[in-house]
Amino acid sequence: METEVEHTGLAIHPMDQFIVKKLFCHTESTAPMNECTTNIHWYDITNVTMWMAIAVLVIAAILVLGTRRRAIVPSRSQSVAELLYGFIHNMVEEVTGHEGVKYFPYVMTLFLFVLCGNVLGLLPLSFTTTSHMAVTVPLALMVFVGVTALGFMKNGPGFLKMFWVTSAPLAIRPVLAVIEVISYFVRPVSHSIRLAGNMMAGHAVIKVIAGFASIVVVSPVVVGAVTAIYALELLVAVVQAYVFTILTCVYLRDAVGDAHH
């Protein structure tokens, strides 16, 4: 059955692009699942680690090129660096207040890493690192654990007051407190799944539509559709990085601001 489908040009495997593979593997098998994709250990260098390293190098290049020759009349690289700096700095200050600005370096690093991971995944033959929960979950957990620790460090036991809705009638406050606690611990789940799900869905759709390009009759339509979706995915890549970052700022505000509702 698989052979017949392949001859029709419709053998589409949109999820193969998300398979984690070892970069150094001796097998010559072309099967989707072989020893290059199984028995992967923490010390193995995979396509995920390679593209995360590339993202870090891109971020470093942007910042180094944008700041090495600062001038009153900025160059293009300096303009890009200043635009990113001003955009994230204003976001942090507006959402978290003046007290949260001291955490701006972490927020900007997080934004640039997610943005580069999203955008690099649109390149041909690349790998979208932010489509994997193995990447987005640690990012979300770092935010969750860091914000929680910071909240207790700055407010002590008073940080728990954020779960007690004083504006609600006393009779329903215990129920609301349970809901608030549950929603708080669900934060890293929604924070990570939102990013990974959006990036995976968009790339899978592109792969499915591109699979029909072999049909000559509809190929012009397919090329146009893929181009349009690529443009949309570029927008989604930026928006998802923004959403991930602004949610981080919102969570940070709970820790550095007033814990009361």
UniProtKB/Swiss-Prot annotation:
Assembly and binders: F-type ATPases have 2 components, CF(1) - the catalytic core - and CF(0) - the membrane proton channel. CF(1) has five subunits: alpha(3), beta(3), gamma(1), delta(1), epsilon(1). CF(0) has four main subunits: a, b, b' and c.
Principal location: membrane
Compartment list: Cell inner membrane
Stored NCBIfam families: ATP_synt_6_or_A (TIGR01131), PRK05815.2-4 (NF004482)
UniProt xrefs under PROSITE patterns: ATPASE_A
Entries under HAMAP family matching the protein: ATP_synth_a_bact (MF_01393)
Keywords attached to this entry: ATP synthesis, Cell inner membrane, Cell membrane, CF(0), Hydrogen ion transport, Ion transport, Membrane, Transmembrane, Transmembrane helix, Transport
Similarity comment: family membership: Belongs to the ATPase A chain family.
Short name of one Pfam family: ATP-synt_A
Biological function: Key component of the proton channel; it plays a direct role in the translocation of protons across the membrane.
Residues annotated as transmembrane: 45-65, 107-127, 133-153, 162-182, 209-229, 232-252
Record organism: Cereibacter sphaeroides (strain ATCC 17023 / DSM 158 / JCM 6121 / CCUG 31486 / LMG 2827 / NBRC 12203 / NCIMB 8253 / ATH 2.4.1.) (Rhodobacter sphaeroides)
Membrane topology of the entry: Multi-pass membrane protein
PANTHER family: ATP SYNTHASE SUBUNIT A
GO cellular component, one term: proton-transporting ATP synthase complex
GO molecular function: proton-transporting ATP synthase activity, rotational mechanism
Entry protein name: ATP synthase subunit a
